[in-house]
Amino acid sequence: MKVSDFDYSLPEERIAKYPPDNRGATRLLVLNRHTGSVQHARYSNLEAFLGYGDLLVINTTKVVRARLFAVKQTGAAIELMLLEKHEGPQNLALYRGRLKKGDRLLAHGHELIVEELAGQGVARLSVEGIESVHALFQNHAEVPIPPYLKRDAEAVDRERYQTVFAEHPGSVAAPTASLNMTPELLLKLEKGGVATAVMTLHVGLGTFLPIRTETMEEHVMHREFYSIPARTIEQIHETRRSGGRVVALGTTVTRALEHAATRISAFSGSDPLVGEADIFIHPGYSFQTIDALLTNFHAPRSTVLMLTAAFAGADHLRAAYREAVEKRYDFLSYGDSMLIS
């Protein structure tokens, strides 16, 4: 299939530039992937669409401070996005501006050196005057909100661009399907017999890289580290046996569970399943682990839109997106949600 098949017109005013005043005070579009029928609800009423015995799987990753501004010796400003969290002598970073090998950048009294240009707007950096590039970013960088918000990070983003269950640092972007979730709603779901299971996938480089190929088959997917605890796998098996549904809270959870599907089915150990998800899910894919997906409204031509289309059915999703635009739903990270089942 062509990447252009997943283009659509998204009016600028439909992109939520800020989070709602109250977390979770958003709308919910409910799509039946078998019939294409649509219902409109409030996110706070999610429990009406999940049932006793269902299992909601959440991503406990935490967004790290990864966005830093530096200045070249010429005075030109360079924006950097850290792509690795290790504390080795060099780190990869996405950059905005013009760089060449050997350039020296000043940031908060320290010099960053461009050791190598790795392609696709990525540079390998070292630093002088501090123990590591990672340490410089952790001391001085800010939370990397998405570029399509077209603004600098503000105080509100420090809280609201993290999920309420963020625990394990490592992501350069939030698992945005979780941004609307609240402790109160999780408690309502629990009282209704919906269990919660945890896992971690660190959102990485691919979130910021566009698809540059004409066909999906040519696209090489990025890798993202994940860890699925043994208890979560046990809960998945228990849910299957009892006839409940495995509900993925977001595309990050979906990628991890589907990448590990074969190992989950055969699992009998006590250690977590770890891996690097490089699976590119698009229409034609046969889902093995999840039964429902709670997600955002995604950007045109994005890999997460293609994953959602694979689960919902491309025609059903196109129709639902058209209706969402017409009914003035808010799109992207800080926007409304949809439940597909």
Swiss-Prot record:
Pathway per the UniProt entry: tRNA modification; tRNA-queuosine biosynthesis
Reactions catalysed, as given in the entry: 7-aminomethyl-7-carbaguanosine(34) in tRNA + S-adenosyl-L-methionine = epoxyqueuosine(34) in tRNA + adenine + L-methionine + 2 H(+)
CC per GO annotation: cytoplasm
Sorted UniProt keywords: Cytoplasm, Queuosine biosynthesis, S-adenosyl-L-methionine, Transferase
A GO BP entry: queuosine biosynthetic process
MF annotations from Gene Ontology: S-adenosylmethionine:tRNA ribosyltransferase-isomerase activity
Subcellular location: Cytoplasm
Broadest EC class assigned to this enzyme: transferase
HAMAP family, sorted: QueA (MF_00113)
Family that this chain belongs to: Belongs to the QueA family.
NCBIfam families: PRK00147.1, queA
Record protein name field: S-adenosylmethionine:tRNA ribosyltransferase-isomerase
